[in-house]
């Protein structure tokens, strides 16, 4: 509904989801990759156990790309060395709903006004017998205030491979890394102070992920047009 774009979607407009059929699904993994937190050396100390949990557990979600999304990324008419920007709404979808710390539970997603920067740029690296290799890079910065303030600031890099004959993406590897702070309402136990957060994206090895909507899809309109 165009009337709700540009502001938060009221709760009564968030369901049922009326899910679209995704053209491409990516697995999304999150991991607390480094912390500066000092913990008690006592093995049974709760902080020590939580620190171990943060360092060894991985959050999982799924990024859905629609037919429109993949069409705007289509490199078939692009030349080697050509650069272009991914649509802003797609960069914002990734920033708001997927660049989050969901290692310990369901995260609070960033709001529309929380995204200070979200941009992605692509470049064709090579074309060989119908296979196009693409580099993607970008940057992001989100800050959420309120009772559970969080922040994530960093860069995203990756490699994409597209088969022009089958018209399918055969590789879609992205890696976002940056500095994060804070915890969500349902993600207690985040490291104190700042910590490094890593979020990785890839095409799943099977079709199981296709059946599982992204957590952010509970806010369908915001997810598709953030």
Please report, for each region that a protein language model flagged, where it lies by residue.
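Acidic, serine/threonine-rich low-complexity disordered tracts
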Residues: 6-226
């Amino acid at each position: 509904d165009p009337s709700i774009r540009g502001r938060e979607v009221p709760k009564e407009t968030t369901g049922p989801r009326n899910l679209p059929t995704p053209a491409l699904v990516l697995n999304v993994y999150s991991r607390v990759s480094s912390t500066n937190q000092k913990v008690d050396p006592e093995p049974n100390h709760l902080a020590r156990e939580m620190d171990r949990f943060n360092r060894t557990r991985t959050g999982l979600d799924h990024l859905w790309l629609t037919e429109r999304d993949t069409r705007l990324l289509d490199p078939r008419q692009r030349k080697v060395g050509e650069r272009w920007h991914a649509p802003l709404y797609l960069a914002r979808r990734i920033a708001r709903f997927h660049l989050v710390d969901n290692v310990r539970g369901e995260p609070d997603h960033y709001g529309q006004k929380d995204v200070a920067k979200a941009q992605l740029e692509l470049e064709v690296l090579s074309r060989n017998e119908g296979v196009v290799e693409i580099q993607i890079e970008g940057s992001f910065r989100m800050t959420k205030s309120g009772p559970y303030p969080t922040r994530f600031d960093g860069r995203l890099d990756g490699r994409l491979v597209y088969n022009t004959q089958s018209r399918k993406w055969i590789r879609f590897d992205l890696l976002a890394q940056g500095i994060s702070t804070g915890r969500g309402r349902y993600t207690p136990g985040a490291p104190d102070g700042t910590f490094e957060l890593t979020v990785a994206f890839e095409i799943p090895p099977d079709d199981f992920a296709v059946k599982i909507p992204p957590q952010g899809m509970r806010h369908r309109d915001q997810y598709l047009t953030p």
